[in-house]
Swiss-Prot record:
Cell compartment(s), UniProt: Nucleus
Disulfide-bonded cysteines: none
Gene: ETT1
Annotated region described as Disordered, given as residue ranges: 1-36, 222-241
UniProt entry keywords in alphabetical sequence: Nucleus, Transcription, Transcription regulation, Translation regulation
One BP term from GO: positive regulation of SREBP signaling pathway
InterPro entries: Nro1/ETT1, TPR-like_helical_dom_sf
Name by which UniProt lists this protein: Enhancer of translation termination 1
Matches recorded under PANTHER family: ENHANCER OF TRANSLATION TERMINATION 1
GO CC term (a single one): nucleus
Keyword Transcription recorded: yes
Family: Belongs to the ETT1 family.
Positions with biased composition (Low complexity): 1-11, 21-30
């Protein structure tokens, strides 16, 4: 799999620290009207404190996760429940430990000066949960999420281009640990046939991995952009010719950037996630579409390098006579790109929504890219172009001309009336 050049999801963004805090967060569960209304599951007991905690966490996890007040409320409620259960000498359920730890890790976003402490407390809570429930699906999924969240906030944010392995923890080992714990939860959920665990909330773990890999892939680019902003306009032409900064082999992120191991892991486990989602009894159409979209995008990005090799060696006179580029011969690049584009199409077609023309256009654009991997004006190329055109005409009509430009480009027209 080619290294991701664009990323599959949104690049991880630093969260703005809230400037206003409440002095009454401990009373969150007692004064819900001061925060928000929490909806309980129909089967949940309104007098069940643990059910209320679950509902509060579910409300937060489905929100934009920008509510420090709610996070503090969840943590205070967990503290209270923990004291009460200790007094009763009763064991709390596994999901309690997961919620408590996740809330502590979320707090790290709002209190950057306490990042290390927040993650340490979160991991200690998870270890306590695993001591009581070694094979808990919820606790293991939560631990994977916390370990992934810690990497950018506690470690990558402190790195510079000049950083060396000996001065920082081994980021690769931390990443491996997070993925290993995820696999424990995944395997256990499959073994118990608890397919409901493969839901939107736990899909966030795979998205978190994608964001972390994105951050690592773009680490040097960020440094370069910051440097360029400080330079004069006179150096603009020179800047454009500069190559992306290469990390030294002793940099903490070097080996992660240099391998496709984690990209393959992401795809393989996203495929597993999709397989398990299809086994759920309830309607999961939207979740399946989301997964298929992500998988389709990953194959599109996998095709980028071989496609560029093929088109460059085939059509760029500056490379005339060159036998290979980036380790690939022209025919090899063509074949690999065709295979990846076809795989992308398989998933993008499954991701189509009759009410969302953008999803149709994703398919059409993949068809055009695939057509570009065939000889000019060949039957194969015309076949893919024709199919793409039909889709674009439909999408253009449905959106009153939104895709007119791409349709004209495909037709080679200056104007279009569709």
């Amino acid at each position: 799999m080619a290294k991701r050049q664009l990323g599959l999801g949104k690049a991880a963004k630093a969260k703005k620290q809230k400037t206003e805090t409440s002095q009454s967060t401990a009373a969150t569960s007692q004064k819900p009207n001061e925060t928000l209304r929490v909806e309980l599951n129909e089967e949940a007991d309104a007098d069940d404190e643990l059910a209320q905690l679950q509902a509060l966490w579910n409300t937060y996890s489905k929100s934009d996760k920008e509510n420090e007040l709610m996070v503090n409320g969840i943590i205070h409620e967990c503290d209270r429940l923990l004291r009460n259960w200790d007094e009763k000498n009763e064991a709390l359920p596994d999901y309690f430990h997961a919620i408590y730890a996740l809330a502590l890790s979320e707090l790290a976003k709002y209190k950057p000066e306490e990042t290390s402490q927040c993650f340490q407390m979160a991991l200690e809570r998870l270890d306590a949960g695993l001591a009581a429930y070694p094979k808990s699906i919820d606790v293991n999924f939560a631990k994977s999420r916390v370990l992934l969240a810690r990497i950018p906030l506690q470690y990558i944010s402190t790195l510079e281009v000049s950083s060396q392995v000996g001065d920082y923890p081994n980021v690769s080992e931390m990443l491996d640990e997070a993925l290993s714990v995820y696999e424990v939860a995944e395997t256990e959920a499959e073994a118990r046939k608890e397919y409901s665990k493969f839901n939107e909330d736990n899909l966030d773990i795979l998205q978190a991995l994608d964001d972390v890999l994105d951050m690592m892939d773009n680490f040097c680019k960020k440094e370069e952009e910051e440097d360029e902003e400080k330079e004069d306009d006179d150096d603009e032409e020179e800047d454009e010719e500069e190559e992306v900064i290469q990390l030294a082999e002793n940099h903490p992120l070097y080996h992660i950037q240099a391998t496709d191991k984690y990209n393959f892991w992401w795809r393989n486990h996203t495929l597993k996630f999709l397989t398990n989602v299809t086994k759920r009894t309830e309607n999961t159409t939207q979740l399946q579409r989301e997964l298929c979209t992500r998988l389709g995008q990953s194959y599109l990005q996998e095709a980028e390098v071989p496609a560029n090799v093929y088109t460059t060696l085939k059509y760029d006179d500056d490379y005339a006579g060159l036998g290979e580029l980036q380790g690939l011969q022209m025919e090899e690049g063509q074949k690999l790109a065709q295979e990846s584009f076809k795989e992308a199409l398989k998933y993008l077609k499954k991701a189509q929504d009759d009410d969302d023309p953008d999803t149709w256009v994703n398919v059409a654009e993949a068809m055009i890219s695939l057509g570009n991997m065939y000889e000019m004006d060949s039957p194969d190329q015309e076949k893919w172009y024709d199919e793409a055109e039909k889709i674009l005409v439909r999408a253009n009509k449905a959106t009153q001309g939104k895709y007119r430009e791409i349709l004209e480009n495909l037709r080679g027209e200056d104007e279009g009336d569709e």
